[in-house]
Amino acid sequence: MEQATRSYFDKRGEILVKNLQKRHFEAYYCATKEEALKQVLELIPEGSTVGWGGAVSAAQVGVQAAVHAGNYTVIDRDQFSDPAEKLRCMRECFNADYFITGANSLSIDGQMVNIDGNGNRVGMIVYGPKNIIVVAGMNKVCPSVEDAVKRARTIAAPMNQQRFGLPNPCSCTGVCGNCLNETSICNQILITRNCKPAGRIKFVLVGEELGF
């Protein structure tokens, strides 16, 4: 990464951490993926029950692999091919001690935006697991919450759609078609503007480009 980009991310990271803390989130800034992995593992006591959704950024940091290798009870839907077992795992995550997720976007004033297909990820952010850990690269940070919603819909969702390959317009065009398909991955949009109870949601911001 160029030094100018690193310096830019570092400066914005410092501002964002302060703004997240004003909104009662726990927040940490890590310059590298290696630092971020260490920080995430420091937040999760051994013996905890840990689950996650489709957390690409966390996977790029190495969180899921480290949790599998550690002394934790793991809830991982990707271990199953049977849809019923996958659904069971998704529901089981509501009782996890820690749920690991990413963010589709963040506003520099400390608000998080997520867009979801099934609703399990946004549902758990709102209510369920005792602790939420959000791993997010600084490429996700936008000037305003309006820009963050726009990013979630027009960048994050179409890019995620390329992973899933579902028969939605953005699969073919790369552009949001504002579809209402049964296969849409954009059925719920969640703005998390404050944390209650304080500290339940913990951000580990990474000074690199991660996820979509």
Tell where the protein language model's regions lie, with residue ranges.
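Conserved phosphate- and dinucleotide-binding cores of soluble alpha/beta proteins
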Residues: 94-212
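N-terminal start-of-chain detector that recognizes signal peptides
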Residues: 1-2, 21-24, 71-74, 85-87, ...
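N-terminal active-site beta-alpha-beta segment that forms phosphate/nucleotide-binding
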Residues: 9, 13-90, 95-99
